[in-house]
């Protein structure tokens, strides 16, 4: 889910951040 991190790095809802 790298897309989510690139789109919303502040939220980091993907779990990788």
Swiss-Prot record:
The keyword ATP-binding applies. It comes from Glycine max (Soybean). Actins are highly conserved proteins that are involved in various types of cell motility and are ubiquitously expressed in all eukaryotic cells. Essential component of cell cytoskeleton; plays an important role in cytoplasmic streaming, cell shape determination, cell division, organelle movement and extension growth. It is found in: Cytoplasm, Cytoskeleton. Transmembrane segments: none annotated. Disulfide bonds: none annotated. There are at least 16 actin genes in soybean. One of its GO terms (cellular component) is cytoplasm. Keywords: ATP-binding, Cytoplasm, Cytoskeleton, Nucleotide-binding. This is Actin-6. Belongs to the actin family. One of its GO terms (molecular function) is ATP binding.
């Amino acid at each position: 889910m790298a897309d989510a991190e690139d789109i919303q790095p502040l939220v980091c809802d993907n779990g990788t951040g």
